[in-house]
Amino acid sequence: MFSKFTSILQHAVEALAPSLPLQEDFVYHWKAITHYYIETSDDKAPVTDTNIPSHLEQMLVILVQEENEREFGETGPCMEYLLHHKILETLYTLGKADCPPGMKQQVLVFYTKLLGKIRQPLLPHINVHRPVQKLIRLCGEVLATPTENEEIQFLCIVCAKLKQDPYLVNFFLENKFKSLVSQGGPNAISEDVLKSQDSLSTDTGQSCQAEEPLGASGTEHTDLGDQPSHQMGDLSTSLENLSVTALPEATVVRPNQDYNLVNSLLNLTRSPDGRIAVKACEGLMLLVSLPEPAAAKCLTQSTCLCELLTDRLASLYKALPQSVDPLDIETVEAVNWGLDSYSHKEDASAFPGKRALISFLSWFDYCDQLIKEAQKTAAVALAKAVHERFFIGVMEPQLMQTSEMGILTSTALLHRIVRQVTSDILLQEMVFFILGEQREPETLAEISRHPLRHRLIEHCDHISDEISIMTLRMFEHLLQKPNEHILYNLVLRNLEERNYTEYKPVCPEDKDVVENGLIAGAVDLEEDPLFTDISPDNTLSNQEWLSSSPPATPDHPKTDGKTEVHKIVNSFLCLVPDEAKSSYHVEGTGYDTYLRDAHRQFRDYCAICLRWEWPGSPKALERCNLEAAFFEGHFLKVLFDRMGRILDQPYDVNLQVTSVLSRLSLFPHPHIHEYLLDPYVNLASGCRSLFSVIVRVVGDLMVRIQRIQDFTPKLLLVRKRLLGLEPEGPVIDHITLLEGVIVLEEFCKELAAIAFVKYHAASTP
């Protein structure tokens, strides 16, 4: 109470006293602070019970007033006094000792306001950036301290200054050799090492050298202004009596202390106070985005940034429950790293592990955004660290395990982060993790060359339908990502030489349609090696399912584009025979319903693939290596195998398989279009295409239809139940087959719509 009264009385006296020149006023306030340490004997009283806060505030007011009265960039006498007499160094020492209690908080506030309110650049001054560096080291040492808010405010203003003037970062890239081994002096550092550190020198135009030695007592030397020598001695004695003895700086080389600003921010990201943690994350994001190459290099090589980011990601992943419902992982609300606030009591859709899941996804989102904003060198290093320390070190063992529940949970989490990632550089590392970096054509003998890729593709045909569906969904979303390597690794590298085709020089008679409506080189069930197990008596004639069309190959341009697309569309629409169709009995389920979606999706895919510079037409057969053995690749092999069993698989599995195949068909690459959407491609012996696989399914279907009584009415009833037009009733025999037929019909209509849209887009200028 007495100190507060004294403070009020002092303000009143100052208000009534005649105004002094600014410099005299500034020196007065500073000497008032130093006299406190000389005269006081009570080192336990909090700083708020002294006049120190008001004197510091008045010093700031004077400095701001002085700058406003002068030309921009001109240094006034008060600022000169502050710099020349190393006032910031002294304040740092007092703040480090926290004497009187609460002094550290006052020093942090003073530094923050000084850097924030003074417009002229202060950090280039050695008597500013050196104490700022030292004060940075005090931040984040202990979490949940009373000064945590002031610490983050101070660090953020430093980050803002660096963002404003990126060259200033060089003052905060500390030379790791500045702290020498105690028995060695400056000469212990070789000349070569010193030269290599020039770019990271902390002082403008000064060579790297050891920091000033400490006094015998360990107290850092500070200059308190124009104090008489005896008064300085009294002050030193007072500081020692008040325990204001800064601990000696470490005298050993600290390899990860080059960028203390980063280390302090990293510590504060773990603060229990969410607001502090978010501000620390924002500060790191400012630093990684600085364009200075030296800063990026130091950031990733001389700090623990990469390790701490990825280790936290790993620990949050490991904190997840062993089994989480995949639907919960897929449907949990979108997360944002800056809004990671969750209340279990307020959440009506809570589930076990939701808090842990949101924390993991939020931190992954932060890492993703950090890499997205980072300078390229830093971004690559950060992404590689996530790849090596998290993807390979933590996720891969989970994805490779044999427990079905573990596989399902880990695949669902992989699916979620595939959907969530937005950084191109992190996406690239994720793609390399999932698929590997191989780009040469696959061979059947080497499909397990990249174990994780092989395992994930095998999971698309897993005995567990849930695992199959989840893995197929993951690949479906992966295919939608803007990364050329995904499609090339999974499909395109195996179609590059077009060795799925059989090259036949065109004869004049091949251009004519034969009398019965067949075309030259059309697929024949009896001659197709894939149909040797079907009896000729049980197969349909080609006229019943294949519409007539002239040969259409890229080597022989179409004379009538509209006619060509009409015939190709009809080829898909007529694949399923009339007795197996049910859509025309239900209104609004025609082929045209797929056109709008196909147009939108194809437009989106074209926008993604535009920068990949794909050819507009297939590679000429004369330049293709048609002698090489064709293998469609592990991914298409599994999809085609699944497609071939469409009549015997659950409805949900069939929907997912056809969804992935339709996604592949949408890509505007001529080889993909030819292989998946051209019914009239001349397949080489032993090769199959999507069309030939469907043909075989239809052949099998027509044999099985004849064994089922009331097939068409049952089929229509199942369709209406699936659409919700009929209530659920008694179980229908052959329900899996009937649902498979419905999916097959819809898939053929979807392929027809995609073919139409792609041909229309190709013919439009």
UniProtKB/Swiss-Prot annotation:
Biased composition (Polar residues): 200-209, 538-550
Gene: FHIP2A
Function according to Swiss-Prot or TrEMBL: May be required for proper functioning of the nervous system.
InterPro entries, A to Z: FHIP, FHIP_C, FHIP_KELAA_motif
Pfam families given in the database record: DUF5917, KELAA, RAI16-like
Protein's recorded name: FHF complex subunit HOOK interacting protein 2A
Region of interest: Disordered: 200-234, 538-562
Upper classification of the organism: Eukaryota, Metazoa, Chordata, Craniata, Vertebrata
Organism from which the protein derives: Bos taurus (Bovine)
Assigned protein family: Belongs to the FHIP family.
